[in-house]
Design a protein with these regions (language model features):
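Tubulin/FtsZ superfamily GTPase core signature
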Residues: 1-375
């Protein structure tokens, strides 16, 4: 008698942007066509929300703010999210993993993201926050608001990944425009979410699944996440070095107790190259760390390798400070810093093409005069 084996249902993943910065990040992901994720935009500013490209859009605190935003006040942002708590819970329902992004220091994002995170965690989802810290030139008050917001947020989710905007300066040259610099931050978020979701939704040469992700990120606190890219003869090792030394990220990998990394390359990628990359990463972390990795083929990456590293389990709240030059001497080659991928070091950075998808079946939770409209 034959038996029918039913494959397990794929993990349900949702990505939520809260406030202006968070919604911008979601727009980028929608344009890039990341598959296997439900995208949701949340904002108090009704006009800004009309520009959101996520299929599901939620206006927060319609009665409280009248669609005019939170005025930079996190308390107002929190109250707005609380007013819309029922709708937030509705759009999160059924998710196995939820990414929540925002730019800390403002009103809606800073105040609203803890409410959204708490709702996701209470729903049983693995909840991952990805946030940016403001530039120093934005002023001390905004930085203080951001720090207080992160303290409040950290206890509401499983993992908190922080991208400090000031570290963007390490990826820029004198000709880099402000717009290009912010797109670099979007790149870090985009590739990180893509790599994590790909591990869950795409079978690989060495496969990881949702259980693997959960083992590293469940209740793990602050996390270190980076993407490195390499090309040529030493592409895998170069990608690993670039990921380990990224100036964008706020912590060093050395104190991590859990590490997940994903190697993506073309069909010419060899086992020896994967081993080289794995060794470089393993040597940089605690010998007792729980290390898991996957390998995924992407035909378009013929002569390139991309490595995404996610490190968790740091002892301090936000982890050890980012590595300095002395700590990274072993990552130097011929006097050239490998803290960024080769295409950036050679001045060949270009933002990925803005392939805007036509989003069908949008679902709006933007209150109308007498009802909530869902298209």
């Amino acid at each position: 008698m034959s038996k029918t084996i039913v494959a397990p249902a794929p993990a349900k993943i949702k990505a939520i942007g809260v406030g202006g910065g968070g919604c911008n990040a979601i727009n980028r992901m929608v344009r890039e066509g990341i598959r296997g994720i439900d995208f949701i935009a949340m904002n108090t500013d009704a006009q800004a929300l009309t520009l959101a490209e996520a299929p599901t859009r939620v206006q927060l605190g319609e009665k409280l703010t009248k669609g005019l935003g939170a005025g930079g006040d996190p308390k107002m942002g929190a109250k707005a999210a609380e007013e819309s708590r029922q709708i937030i819970e509705e759009v999160i329902e059924g998710a196995d993993m939820v990414f929540i992004s925002c730019g800390m220091g403002g009103g809606t994002g800073t105040g609203g993201i803890p409410i959204v995170a708490q709702a996701a965690k209470e729903a049983g989802a693995l909840t991952i926050g990805v946030v940016t810290k403001p530039f120093a030139f934005e002023g001390g008050h905004r930085s203080e608001v951001a720090e207080e917001g992160m303290l409040n947020l950290s206890s509401k989710l499983d993992t908190l990944i922080i991208i400090p905007n000031d570290r963007l300066l390490g990826l820029c040259d004198a000709k880099t425009t402000v717009d290009s610099a912010f797109k670099m931050a979007d790149d870090a978020l985009f590739h990180g979410v893509q790599a994590i979701s790909g591990v869950v939704t795409t079978p690989g040469l060495i496969n990881l699944d949702f259980a693997d992700i959960k083992s590293v990120m469940k209740d793990s606190g602050p996390a270190w996440m980076s993407v490195g890219q390499g090309s040529g003869q030493n592409r895998a090792a170069e990608a690993a070095r670039a990921a380990l030394a990224s100036p964008l990220l706020d912590v060093s990998i050395s104190g991590a107790k859990g590490v997940l990394f994903n190697i993506t390359g073309g069909t010419s990628l060899t086992l020896f190259e994967c081993n080289e990359a794995a060794e470089a990463i393993s040597q940089a972390v605690d010998p007792r760390a729980n290390i898991i990795f996957g390998v995924v083929y992407e035909p378009k990456m013929d002569n390139e390798v991309r490595i995404t590293v996610i490190a968790t389990g740091f002892s301090s709240q936000y982890g050890k400070g980012a590595p300095n030059l002395e700590e990274l001497r072993h990552l130097m080659k011929n006097g050239e810093t490998l803290d960024v991928p080769s295409f950036l070091r050679r001045g060949q950075y270009r933002s990925p093409s803005q392939l805007v998808n036509t989003v069908k079946g949008k679902r709006d939770f933007v209150p109308q005069p007498s009802k909530i409209s869902r298209q």
